Amino acid sequence: MSEHERTFVMVKPDGVQRGLIGDIVSRFEDRGLKMVGGKFMQIDQELAEEHYGEHEDKPFFDGLVDFITSGPVFAMVWEGQDATRQVRTMMGETDPAESAPGTIRGDYGLDLGRNVIHGSDHEDEGANEREIELFFDEAELVDWDQIDSSWLYE
């Protein structure tokens, strides 16, 4: 059996402005993932710089910070078997032009800078915990029993 885990996902300002929150949430629910936290918010400069800190020395850092602070986002925590890998697969490639149809970025992404969604990197050990703690207090995460989980997981 695969690992049951939590993962961080964020609908970026372009996805919020285009009214895509509901569709994105539905896709993850349809996949059998369970939302345990959700927050509609405006990211400030300090949080943006901390969130993208790994890219601080890169030429695109200022653009990332400017974009993610340009409008509201919808931050979420999803739970399920291999949740991070499932979410990353459903999101598609970072560049929408390289994303398959049927993925979130393949269907809705416009370009590399406007790719609708962010998800924790499954190859970065600790990325989930770091991002979840950055955006959510423990009290904002809800442990609940999904009634159909016995149908989803062995």
From Swiss-Prot:
Its cofactor is Mg(2+). PROSITE patterns: NDPK_LIKE. Gene3D superfamilies: Nucleoside diphosphate kinase-like domain. The keyword Zinc-finger does not apply. ATP binds at residues 12, 60, 88, 94, 105, 115. Pfam families: NDK. One of its GO terms (biological process) is GTP biosynthetic process. Keywords: ATP-binding, Cytoplasm, Kinase, Magnesium, Metal-binding, Nucleotide metabolism, Nucleotide-binding, Phosphoprotein, Transferase. SMART domains: NDK. CDD domains: NDPk_I (cd04413). SUPFAM superfamilies: Nucleoside diphosphate kinase, NDK (SSF54919). Its EC number is 2.7.4.6. The active site is at 118 (pros-phosphohistidine intermediate). It catalyses: a 2'-deoxyribonucleoside 5'-diphosphate + ATP = a 2'-deoxyribonucleoside 5'-triphosphate + ADP; a ribonucleoside 5'-diphosphate + ATP = a ribonucleoside 5'-triphosphate + ADP. It is found in: Cytoplasm. GO terms for cellular component: cytoplasm. One of its GO terms (molecular function) is ATP binding. Major role in the synthesis of nucleoside triphosphates other than ATP. The ATP gamma phosphate is transferred to the NDP beta phosphate via a ping-pong mechanism, using a phosphorylated active-site intermediate. Belongs to the NDK family. HAMAP family: NDP_kinase. This is Nucleoside diphosphate kinase. It comes from Haloarcula marismortui (strain ATCC 43049 / DSM 3752 / JCM 8966 / VKM B-1809).
